[in-house]
Amino acid sequence: MAGLRLGPLLRHVDWESGTSATVWVETDRACTAEVRCPGGAGGSAPTFCVVGHHYALVVVTGLAPGSATTYEVLLDGERVWPLADSSQPPSTIRTPPVPASGAVVAFGSCRWAAPAVGESDPVGPDVLDTLSARLAADPEAERPDVLLFLGDQVYADETSADTRAWIARHRRAAGTGSAAPPDQVADYEEYTHLYDESWGDPELRWLLSTVPSCMIFDDHDVIDDWNTSAAWVADMRATPWWHERITSGLMSYWVYQHLGNLSPAELAEDTVYAAVLAAGDGTEVLRAFAERADADPATVRWSYRRDFGRTRLLMVDTRAARVLEEQHRTMLDAEEAAWLRTQAFDDPGGVDHLLVGTSLPWLLPPMVHFAEGWHAALCRGERGPRWARFGEWLRRRADLEHWAAFTSSFERLTETIAEVGRADAAPATVCVLSGDVHHAYVAEPVWTAGQQPRSRVFQFTCSPLHNSVPTAIRAGFRFGWSRLANSIGHLLARHGRVARPVIRWERSGGPWFGNQLMTLTLRGRTARLRLEMASAGAKQGRRGTDRTGARLIGVIDRSLTDGS
């Protein structure tokens, strides 16, 4: 009898017709996976195989718009979900009414796997586990229409003690991986263990089975500072274990994260997916694809678009699509940048809210922005070869690789946002959603006279979901918003011969530190922002608590538009 190894994950829900969804599962052997709903809705798919693991992405059809439909998962006709001993409510697929009146979008990034039940948690309660417990306690309460995961869903280079022990046993048994770091994953099998550890968490597993999700990678999904510079790439390609690491990282990302980002129509047109399904064993097909994606990133698009009624999400790849030639560095290659502009301007008048998902923040604390521009200038050779060598050394130690470090890309993104916001049929809001920096804040551009867009424009940064930041770094981020820090930043920019940014911006909220989640409630042309943080110490069993007694506390609840 086939067993359910991981999942189910509810991924894509159709907002155009409100009648279909996709559900992802991993099984322990080849079988037919079926999703069955009351009333006849459902779907089935045979599993496909990658490196001895079996997966299916089931397209569920026959759903009713504006409904909440429970479902179960069967493998070769035997029910495997809900789990026999589960105390969680049934998993449901919620479809929007058509036309949809709005969307509730929750987002964050950077999640270490939560420890097992009964173990202490050195970084505090997991905000997603805590959200899961609140929703399970009151299944009729408002829930997100979608969860956006903005990078570092797994940490391939910062593994837990349990995972390090498992890696050691795996490598001894397999006789492989001796050259790879003992505290980092080396191959596809080790990546599967990371996903088991992260998504097998009972609270998160139920949450992902009942709330749709969209995902994009950041560096730790592969390795810290992934694609930070051309010199870094050259050094890594000369490292004996790197080829298998990057190939396995991209293969596993495609299977565990990317496939579920696609609509059924996009899946039907995806040639790689078709080839994997057609092969008895899709390993070599997917390996060739991953090797090609690493060698020539322009051959693959990881970015994607989702429309939630009149809310548009553009999820942007800011890692694999970079141009790293030092004199012509860009965050996005020409084709990717053109795609972003095309999608942002498509169907003017048909979008009330434009969301740009980018793992790396667009607007940083001003001192950090100036420091990254200064540093990029040093690496280009503005102050000579000695400073350039220092710049490369610093780049690998200080994570100086956000939009600010790619000046032309920063300017082009700013221009795109401003043009969208100034259009006659501009959306009510343009919101850049980011993570990465292990704290949360809100920043708003300060436009010059006569350049004020019709749209309200925001940078919302929310991180981590479950991680930590050292005290010294907290102090640094707080200082980074100060006037003194701004003055220091200007001095650095002058040393690097860096021009002033094309806009100014100010912090209008934060910084906040903790395991946290931001939620946008978008109704018509109104918008509200809520930030909630997981707090320990509540009594066990209290409504809205998780297995450790944590609860979500409100940090801000703020209107972003008139009338909300």
Show where each model-derived region lies.
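Metal-dependent phosphoester/phosphodiester hydrolase catalytic core
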Residues: 1-564
